[in-house]
Amino acid sequence: MYIGIDDTDSREKYCTTYVGTLIVEELLKLGYILEEPRLIRMNPMVKYKTRGNGGVCLKIVGKIGAEDTKKNNSNKNNSNNGTPKNIEYDYKQALEDFNRGNIDYEALSKESNCKSSLKSHIKSLKSLKSYRTTLNPEITEESYKLSKSEYLEVKTIVSSIVEKYTDFDCSTTNPGIVLINSRLTRQKKAILKNYYNSVLTEIVSLDEAEAIIKKVGAEYIKYKKGLGIIGSLGAISSYFSENQTYTYELLAYRENDKWGTERYVIDSSVVEMDKMTYPYTFNNVDNNKNIIAPNTKCPVLYGIRGVSKEILFNAKEIVESENIDKYMIYRTNQGTDHHLRIMNIADARENTGAILSGYISEEFTEITGGHVLIELTDSTGSINCIAYEPTKKFRHIIRELAIGDLITVYGTIREEPYQLNIEKINVVKLNNLYEKVKKCECGGTLKSKGVSSGYKCNKCGKRLKYDEIPKIQIVRNLREGFYEVPPSARRHLSMPLSLINYLPNNLR
């Protein structure tokens, strides 16, 4: 069974990942077995998104004692909720065990401290050209199909938690739940695969989402406008994408009575964590400033992103903060560039992500507000590309570009004004630039008398034609290679350059 949830939060409170965590907690208590939950980010250009345009998906793959439960459905005294009486299950430990998954924590606990286990794990990561874990294929091919009573039980749990932890007072919060409890044919999987591509690169309408839900035999629950079903189905559809590149995020949640108060996360410990775990964790600090803790009143204390669960567990132990109520590790498409597609400039369209290659065709322009604009041209057309003020020093790179430079830009395209918001660039080839030597052999200065008259020395009076003036090559301050915006200005989906060697990508 697949469960998709989206649009429960607002800029003031709550968080869809917290809702997902509470649901996992309740399902584990009832003996349900789940794969690692997913946090899926979608097209960042959607105007009606609440915060990060991300949906959550949970996948039930079994139930402890399910067969015993079916045999004893008629037994009114059966009160173990599907858990066999001979199985001791520590519900307090359930969420912790779920997050740990199949990690050998007995071995890790024998290490002298978290730093030594971290060094051991980093050593193993360094030996890999590309880090990518795989789930057990025996349980990922098909999800567990619930009985009618189990389905109603799960549906009730999901809807009640969504209803309790949604900011219904916010006009832009429109929750939606999608449930799939049927075997999916190859045709239905193909439909979901295409839908995943759509929610990443297009603006999907509510009608389109409802039509797809009907085609694949799913059920949905809409609250208010119900726009959340678009992202809920999008999160589910990630299972059927050909691109299974992923990262992880450990989300630590605050104790309820601290929601809305100032967060206590020691910045120096975050900087230390980043130094110890980089590049296997990412987007932790910007200019030595902690950026893992949000500024909203939501339940999240902080979120650490990385390439493996093990790295995140160790990173969590290094960060010093207020008490953590609970935490969850989500498998995500963050930092994967899933929202970008390689295309010609003529094929680029508004509200989508693009990878465009071409030549700089005009000098940069400074725009009010501190933004910097350049024009990129290929054989099919031209487009303006912008580095906004929050990208700070990255704008210096854009200013160093010159007419004739061959570059590739990565980013999303605005509707109005029509331009590409730069996330990173690859300077493929720098154009050779020259300047005229304005000094005469006698040491005097050559003054221009117009294109037709050439130059005249102000000291000896010697005249030179325009094309007789010697040229020297200008030494460029810019070097060929990749450049990216700082972490604080980076989109959730944008791949940091630090991950090039660890995730399959379009950058290599």
From Swiss-Prot:
The cross-references to Gene3D superfamilies, in alphabetical order and at most eight, read:
2.40.50.1010, 3.30.70.2200, 3.90.600.20
Residues crossing the lipid bilayer are: none
What CDD domains has UniProt attached to this entry? Answer: RPA2_OBF_like
| Signal peptide residue numbers | none
Predominant place of localization: cytoplasm
UniProt-annotated location(s): Cytoplasm
Say if the entry is tagged with keyword tRNA processing: yes
Q: Any one cellular component term from GO for this entry?
A: cytoplasm
- Which GO terms of type biological process are on file? tRNA wobble cytosine modification
Q: In its UniProt entry, what is this protein called?
A: tRNA(Ile2) 2-agmatinylcytidine synthetase TiaS
Q: Which organism is it from?
A: Methanococcus voltae (strain ATCC BAA-1334 / A3)
Cite the source lineage.
Archaea, Methanobacteriati, Methanobacteriota, Methanomada group, Methanococci
